[in-house]
């Protein structure tokens, strides 16, 4: 367990799941109002200090438990910073070295740094920087109302960022220009602009050459439903552009997605229930099943409620470390609220 137990882990609140559900539902509703924000100005990246409190156990009820199906908990961090723009983390990509990362705030900010480890456990964040995400004119995306940045995908030195509220994807030459890169909008696929408000683009995955769908950017909505009630997805570029669907089950919505080294897609999903509060799960989808017109589904690797060390988990990244282990990194969106947390959690996936 964490060294300092958050107030909602107290006996009274942890037993009152209905109250927790109401709390989180209210929080998500308030985020719409909170978007009336002070807009950032284009400026050099700011070096920031990030304080990290260890999360030593994932199962609050059984702190000694490390194995969760095919996933083994490595450790985690609860992150805090006095920097005013820190928070709201909605996506993350961790480099192949397992240390350097870049993340997004849903208010239109980059957050990058380096994870330091004690053995295999995350132990802190160093070399942290934040900067506003820039549009094609060199001004912050937020200045044009494009601040709901929710997803990120990587193709070598190119980054793709999805902006939910305006149903837009922008491309950055991050490898050459770093945090000063300007985003260039790419043409949206058919049906993209008709996604519902605040339930639009939530996950991006780029498929590298050599895999099925190589060269394709996969985009998945949070809860843009087709006629059958399944979640809408899109294939941009690559050999087979078009639309597909992810089978929706148990009222879960999509939060993020990441590609496994072998090619399958992991979906991070989230559900709010009036009875059980907040729930998250990770589902595995075969890449070969994703094609225009298909409805895809797959096994659940992890499902967790508030009896586990979770918050509003929104970002998922996968990398293979020097030892050949497949490592999952998750990050949460604290909605800039003092009673929520920015959690960074890591698991090792045992490949079947």
Regions found by a protein language model. Give the residues of each.
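Sequence/structural signature of beta-propeller domains
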Residues: 2, 7-8, 21, 29-352
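Sec-dependent signal peptide recognition
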Residues: 17-25
């Amino acid at each position: 367990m964490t060294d300092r137990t958050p107030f909602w882990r107290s006996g009274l609140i942890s037993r009152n799941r209905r109250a927790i559900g109401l709390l989180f539902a209210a929080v998500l509703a308030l985020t719409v109002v909170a978007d009336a924000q002070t807009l950032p100005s284009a400026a050099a990246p700011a070096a920031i200090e990030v304080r990290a409190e260890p999360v030593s156990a994932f199962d609050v009820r059984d702190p000694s438990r490390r194995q969760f199906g095919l996933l083994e908990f490595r450790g985690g961090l609860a992150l805090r910073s006095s920097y005013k723009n820190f928070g709201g983390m909605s996506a993350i990509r961790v480099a192949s070295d397992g240390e350097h990362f870049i993340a997004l705030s849903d208010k239109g900010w980059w957050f990058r740094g380096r994870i330091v480890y004690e053995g295999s456990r995350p132990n802190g964040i160093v070399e942290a920087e934040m900067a506003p995400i820039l549009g094609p004119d060199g001004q912050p995306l937020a200045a044009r109302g494009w601040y709901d940045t929710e997803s990120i995908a990587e193709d070598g030195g190119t980054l793709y960022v999805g902006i939910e509220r305006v149903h837009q994807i922008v491309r950055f030459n991050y490898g050459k220009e770093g945090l000063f890169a300007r985003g260039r909008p790419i043409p949206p696929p058919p049906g993209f602009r008709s996604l519902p408000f605040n339930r639009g683009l939530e996950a991006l995955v780029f498929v590298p050459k050599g895999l099925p769908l190589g060269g394709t950017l996969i985009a998945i909505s949070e809860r843009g439903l087709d006629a059958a009630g399944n979640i809408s997805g899109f294939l941009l570029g690559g050999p087979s552009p078009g639309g597909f669907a992810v089978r929706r089950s148990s009222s879960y919505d999509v939060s993020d997605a990441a590609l496994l080294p072998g090619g399958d897609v992991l979906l991070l999903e989230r559900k709010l229930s009036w009875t059980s509060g907040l729930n998250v799960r990770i589902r595995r989808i075969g890449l070969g099943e994703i094609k225009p017109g298909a409805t895809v589904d797959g096994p659940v690797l992890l499902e967790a409620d508030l009896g586990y060390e979770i918050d509003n988990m929104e970002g998922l990244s996968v990398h293979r470390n020097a030892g050949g282990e497949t490592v999952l990194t998750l990050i949460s969106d604290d909605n800039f609220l003092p009673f929520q947390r920015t959690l960074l959690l890591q698991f090792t996936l045992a490949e079947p």
